[in-house]
Amino acid sequence: MKKRICRVLALCLVLCLLLSGCQAIGEYFSVMGSLLMGGSAYRFSDMNYVRPDLERFQADLDACCLAAETERDLQKLLDQIYAFYTVFDEICTAQALSMIHYSKNMTDAYWEAEYQFCSALDGELTAGLDRLYRALAKSPLRPQLEGEAYFGADFFVAYEGESLYDEAFCAMLAQESQLQNQYLALYATVGQMEQATFLENHAETLAEVLAQLVILRRQMAEYAGYDSYPEFAYEFYHARDYTPAQTTAYLADIRAELVPLFQQIAETKPEITLYSCTQTDTYEYVRQTANGLGGTFLQAFWLMEQSGLYDIAAGEEKYAGSFEVYIADYQVPYVFVNPTETEYDKLTFAHEFGHFCNDYASYGGQVGVDVAEVFSQGTEYMSLLYGPADANLTKLKMLDGLCVYVEQGALASFEQQLYTLAEEELNAQGMQALYSRVCTSFGLEGSMEYVLVPHFYTSPLYVISYVVSNDAALQIYQMEQATTGTGRKCLEESLYTSQGYFLAFLEEAGLKSPFATGRLAEVKQMLQQILQ
């Protein structure tokens, strides 16, 4: 029997609604707007890192669970919940700050230790929330808590059954975190040598770590009552409203529809140049994009600029990638990019800025990863129309869009099949053989590069999000091209969504499902016109 699980997708937003009702969000943005204009918002350089106090976390959790059982005064119970959330947010803030500082210098032993300590708390935090919500589900004040002004109708239904977060499962989560940190410690050195040298020295070790993760994750899925790890991850981590089987069918359609186009373009070599690009060029590109888009995008950029909530400088000791993270206690997002110093950096910064805008607009509320990636990739596409005019960059982005379908599709296919490999094949040789087969089927070459994909280690079954969200983002671009202002309006309004499920979000936004019959043929026709 499948154990009941529920991943909290909008914790910060729920916290805001729980304490103050919907009106608080509007008041928050009004206050934030005045802070921006007055230049009074917290700067990143003034943010203080405090190592999480686990004893306080546990004590407040115990007190909150006891209050859920015994308290008859709604306001007193809400105050107790608030006290717990305060500690919870402090830990989330420490996690975000430690990740940012460690990413800025991955040779810094202090920040490495702090990041590893904080990241290892994920399982404990989620288990704590699960325990709290199960206690509230039994509270005599549950009817009031499930009112519209607080958690909402039937919120606690998901917490009435058996909890997954027992000692055994939490131990698995801790083991997973240890393996992830083992990977990141080695991955931190990738920028210190040529990629070929790095792979020669470390590929087999990293492959072994991935194999251990696959074995462990299959055990986790079985323990939770699922037939496969992809099914488990789709629900537990990503809250998807489509299945791994739908993904498999979609990837087969990409192979049939877009891989031949990809191969044709690779042979003809379109006239696209990857120009060099300075940090100033990258910053100016996104600044002009925000000015052109206006509204929420411009407000978010002001916040990012005035509070120093970004790092786009190059560095050999920095994390070799990019991300955006929300800093809960300060109620602001942060963007990190380690640039390649090519024109592609403009798109990368625009991508992470799209995530920044969503977190700014939604008060840090979390949606499903597929929905979140629509905002980032949508901002990339819209930058082509609202940023500085650049025909070469437009072609580069469209080629990149095709590559997302094909190359990220190949990675998604490899990852999904990886969790079906026989245990005797879960080694460097067996995984390489699978990777080569998958790459060949997508018209690509493949060696050991899969060990350089952090998502396989830290965010399992995430990669398909890039593919399906790319399709939605491309639709927003097409909408804007057809009628000026419509795509921009769609993207800005979507930033405020509380709809976490991808297909439901698409319907809400008036967009097609990427799985819709004929959709890939439309994409192929559009890309052919631009790239051939």
Predicted regions and their residues:
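Catalytic zinc-binding patch centered on the HExxH motif and its immediate surroundings
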Residues: 310-332
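C-terminal, non-catalytic "cap/extension" segments appended to globular domains
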Residues: 159, 357, 412, 420, ...
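Hydrophobic core
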Residues: 13, 17-19
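Short pre-active-site segment immediately N-terminal to the catalytic Zn-binding motif
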Residues: 330-349
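Catalytic glutamate of the conserved HExxH
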Residues: 348, 352, 356, 360, ...
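Post-HExxH zinc-binding segment in Zn-dependent metallohydrolases
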Residues: 256-257, 362, 367-405, 469
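A well-structured
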Residues: 27-281
